[in-house]
C-alpha cells in the first residue's frame, strides 16, 4: 500500500472549502455535500514518475478460459496449431512419394531425384525422414549437408543405385527428347518470353535443354517421367502461339530495330518478301498488338517536320565528342540501345584558369545566321487563320544535341545544374495578373504548395492508308489532371501537328545546347460549353467514342482505346493509333527582363514521365515567346542565350 499524501489532501480541502467574498479563494468550486474519496494509483497521484515501469496485472489464462463459455472463439488459434503440427508430416509424406519404383536408376534420373530432394526440403525434414526409418542414426546426421542427406535416403533407405545410361548409335541418350522445327520461332519464343522464365522453371525440375540454332533443334534430357511431362507442357505452350501479318507502307526497319522490338515485346518477326509483310508471332494476342505499336512508332516519320543543325563556336576552339552517360534515365526505348556523344570544347591540360573567357562567353549570333534560322523556321508553314483555329508557337528548349556512331543525331531535353539556381528566385507567371508586379516566390515553394499544373499527353500516329494519298498530320490529345490525379475529360484538346520546324544550336563552349522550335497546330474542338455540352463533340464521333469506351485511370494505359477515327478539316476520316503516353507536371515562371514589357516570355519548367512504350522520366526547360510577331527572332535568341 502506498502512503496517503497529507499535503495533497490539505490542498484539496482548501480548494473545495466554503469561502466568503473576502477570501482569496473566492470563486473556487465548493466541496460537494456528500464527500467521496477518489483513490488514485501512484502514477496518477504523481508519486511515481512516468518512465518507471509498474507491474501490470495480467489475468490468468486458466481463469480467462473458464470465463468464456464459447469455445469457438479460440478456434482460429487451434487451426494454426493444427497446421503447424502437420507441416512436418506433410513434408515426410511428400518425400515418401518420391521413392522410385525401380532400384536401378539411370544416371540422369538419379541426379534429377537427388537435386529434387536437395532443393525442395530443408535439413531438418530430411533428418526426420531418416529417423523414422533408422531411429539409431539420428546422432551422426546432425552436421550433414542436404546433398549428403538426400544421397543417404536414396542409397541407404530406398536401396537405389545409379547405372550408366545406354546410348543409341547416333550418340543421343535414350533418356532424351528431341524437337525439330522448320524455323527458330518456337525456340526463340521459349527463350525470350518472360526473359526465359519458362525454361528456368523446367530446369528447376531437373531437365537439361540443349539448343542447336543452326538446325532449329531442341533436345531435352531428364528422367522418363519428367520427359513425358515436358513433352506435354511444351506442346501445350506452342499450341498457344498466335500469328498476324503486318503490311509495311513505309521504309523497312533495320535489323537492329526489329531485334529491339522482339526483345521489348517478346515476339518473333518473320519477313515475307513475296507479300512485303511481316509475320509476327507471340504467345498472346496482347504481345502482338504491342509489337505493332512499337513497329509503327519506330518506322513512322512525320513528313511535316524539318530539323537543321548549326554549330556556334570559334574556329580556334578545339572540340571533341564526349560520351553521354544519362541514356537510361532520359532516352526513349528506340535510342536507349545506342551510344551517344555530345560535341564539347577541350580545355588544355596546361590551362591554369578554369574559368576561361572562351567557356563562359555568351554565343554571339550574326545577322546572316539569324536570317538563315528564319528561313529554316518558315518552311512549309500553313496560312494562319483564326477561323481554322491554327496558331503558332515559338519556343527554345535547353538540352543536348547528341550524335551516334552511325552519324544519326537527336536532341535530348536536359536541364544543367547551373540553371537550377537561376530558377529558384523567379516569380510565378500568372496570365490573369500579367500587368501587376508579382511577388517573387522561390521555385521550391511553388512545388511544395502544389502550384503546378498536371497534364497527360497522348501521341497518335496516322495509320498508313491502303491507297496512295497525301500523309495526314500527327495527332496529340491533351487532358488536364486535377489535384486527385483524375483526368478531366471536359478539358480534352485534340491538336493536329501541321508543321514543326526546328533549328538546333550546338554550343560546345556552353553547358547546354539550344533547340529553336516553331510549331503550327490546329485545334479540332472548341472550348467545352456547359450550357450546350452536346454540341462539343457533334462533329467528332470518333472522339466521342474514345471518351465513352476508355476507362480513365492514371498510369493504367491498357484501358484506353488504342485506335480512333478523326474527322480532318478536309472532310476525310483518318484512323490514328496510340503510340505513346506522357505525363507532365508544369510550372510557368516569369522571364526576367529589364524592359517595361515583362510578360513577353514564359519559362516553362516541366517534369515529364514516360509511359506505355517507354519508362523513366526527364525534366525540360522551355522559353516560350508569347507573341512571336511582336518580338524579333534575334532578340528572342539573344535573351535566352544571356539567361
UniProtKB/Swiss-Prot annotation:
Function: Involved in aerobic respiration where it is required for assembly of respiratory chain enzyme complexes III and IV. Also has a role in mitochondrial gene expression. May be part of a mitochondrial membrane-associated RNA-shuttling system, delivering NAM1-associated transcripts to the translation machinery.
UniProt KW keywords: Membrane, Mitochondrion, Mitochondrion inner membrane, Protein biosynthesis, Transit peptide
Domain of life the protein comes from: Eukaryota
Subcellular location: Mitochondrion inner membrane
Main location: mitochondrion
Species, as recorded: Saccharomyces cerevisiae (strain ATCC 204508 / S288c) (Baker's yeast)
GO CC annotation, single: membrane
GO biological process per UniProt: aerobic respiration; mitochondrial translation; mitochondrial translational initiation
Pfam family, one: SLS1_N
Basic residues biased stretches: 55-65
Phylogenetic placement of the source organism: Eukaryota, Fungi, Dikarya, Ascomycota, Saccharomycotina
Family: Belongs to the SLS1 family.
Protein name: Sigma-like sequence protein 1, mitochondrial
Amino acid at each position: 500500500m502506498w502512503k496517503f499524501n497529507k499535503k495533497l489532501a490539505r490542498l484539496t480541502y482548501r480548494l473545495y472549502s466554503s469561502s466568503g467574498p473576502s477570501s482569496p479563494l473566492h470563486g473556487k468550486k465548493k466541496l460537494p455535500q456528500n464527500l467521496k474519496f477518489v483513490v488514485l494509483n501512484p502514477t496518477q497521484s504523481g508519486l511515481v514518475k512516468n518512465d518507471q515501469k509498474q507491474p501490470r496485472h495480467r489475468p490468468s489464462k486458466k481463469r480467462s478460459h473458464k470465463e468464456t463459455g464459447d469455445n469457438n472463439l479460440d478456434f482460429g488459434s487451434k487451426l494454426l496449431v493444427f497446421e503447424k503440427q502437420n507441416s512436418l508430416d506433410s513434408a515426410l509424406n511428400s518425400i515418401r512419394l518420391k521413392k522410385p519404383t525401380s532400384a536401378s536408376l539411370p544416371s540422369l534420373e538419379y541426379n534429377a531425384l537427388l537435386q529434387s530432394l536437395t532443393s525442395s526440403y530443408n535439413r531438418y525434414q530430411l533428418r526426420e525422414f531418416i529417423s523414422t526409418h533408422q531411429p539409431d542414426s539420428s546422432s551422426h546426421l546432425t552436421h550433414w549437408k542436404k546433398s549428403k542427406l538426400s544421397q543417404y535416403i536414396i542409397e541407404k533407405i530406398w536401396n537405389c543405385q545409379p547405372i550408366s545410361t545406354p546410348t543409341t548409335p547416333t550418340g543421343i541418350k535414350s533418356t532424351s527428347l528431341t524437337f525439330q522445327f522448320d524455323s527458330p520461332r518456337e525456340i526463340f519464343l521459349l527463350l525470350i518470353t518472360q526473359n526465359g522464365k519458362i525454361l528456368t522453371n523446367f530446369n528447376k525440375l531437373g531437365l537439361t535443354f540443349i539448343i542447336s540454332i543452326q538446325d532449329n533443334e531442341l533436345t531435352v534430357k531428364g528422367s522418363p517421367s519428367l520427359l513425358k511431362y515436358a513433352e506435354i507442357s511444351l506442346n501445350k505452350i506452342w499450341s498457344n502461339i498466335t500469328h498476324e501479318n503486318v503490311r509495311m507502307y513505309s521504309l523497312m526497319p533495320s535489323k537492329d530495330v526489329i531485334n529491339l522490338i522482339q526483345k521489348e515485346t517478346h515476339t518473333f518477326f518473320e519477313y515475307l518478301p513475296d507479300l512485303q509483310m511481316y509475320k509476327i508471332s507471340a504467345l498472346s494476342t496482347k504481345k502482338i498488338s504491342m509489337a505493332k505499336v512499337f513497329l509503327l512508332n519506330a518506322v513512322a516519320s512525320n513528313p511535316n517536320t524539318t530539323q537543321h543543325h548549326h554549330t556556334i563556336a570559334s574556329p580556334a576552339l578545339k572540340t571533341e565528342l564526349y560520351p553521354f552517360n544519362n541514356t537510361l534515365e532520359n532516352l526513349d526505348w528506340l535510342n536507349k540501345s545506342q551510344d551517344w556523344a555530345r560535341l564539347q570544347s577541350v580545355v588544355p591540360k596546361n590551362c591554369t584558369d578554369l574559368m576561361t573567357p572562351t567557356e563562359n562567353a555568351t554565343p554571339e549570333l550574326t545577322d546572316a545566321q539569324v536570317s538563315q534560322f528564319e528561313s529554316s523556321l518558315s518552311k512549309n508553314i500553313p496560312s494562319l487563320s483564326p477561323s481554322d483555329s491554327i496558331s503558332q508557337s515559338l519556343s527554345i528548349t535547353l538540352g543536348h544535341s547528341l550524335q551516334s556512331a552511325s552519324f544519326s543525331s537527336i536532341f535530348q531535353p536536359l536541364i544543367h545544374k547551373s540553371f537550377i539556381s537561376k530558377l529558384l528566385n523567379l516569380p510565378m507567371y500568372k496570365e490573369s495578373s500579367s500587368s501587376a508586379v508579382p511577388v517573387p516566390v522561390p521555385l521550391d515553394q511553388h512545388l511544395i504548395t502544389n502550384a503546378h499544373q498536371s497534364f497527360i499527353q497522348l501521341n497518335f500516329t496516322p495509320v498508313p492508308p491502303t491507297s496512295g494519298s497525301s500523309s495526314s498530320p500527327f495527332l496529340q490529345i491533351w487532358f488536364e489532371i486535377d489535384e486527385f490525379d483524375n483526368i478531366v475529360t471536359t478539358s480534352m484538346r485534340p491538336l493536329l501537328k501541321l508543321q514543326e520546324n526546328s533549328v538546333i544550336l550546338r554550343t560546345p563552349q556552353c553547358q547546354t545546347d539550344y533547340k529553336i522550335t516553331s510549331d503550327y497546330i490546329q485545334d479540332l474542338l472548341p472550348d467545352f460549353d456547359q450550357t450546350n455540352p452536346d454540341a462539343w463533340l457533334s462533329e467528332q464521333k470518333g472522339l466521342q467514342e474514345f471518351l465513352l469506351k476508355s476507362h480513365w485511370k492514371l498510369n493504367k494505359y491498357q484501358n484506353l482505346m488504342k485506335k480512333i477515327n478523326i474527322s480532318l478539316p478536309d472532310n476525310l476520316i483518318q484512323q490514328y493509333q496510340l503510340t505513346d503516353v506522357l505525363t507532365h507536371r508544369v510550372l510557368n515562371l516569369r522571364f526576367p527582363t529589364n524592359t517595361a514589357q515583362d510578360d513577353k516570355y514564359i519559362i516553362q519548367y516541366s517534369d515529364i514521365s514516360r509511359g506505355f512504350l517507354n519508362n523513366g522520366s526527364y525534366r525540360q526547360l522551355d522559353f516560350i515567346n508569347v507573341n512571336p510577331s511582336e518580338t524579333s527572332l534575334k532578340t528572342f535568341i539573344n535573351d535566352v542565350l544571356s539567361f
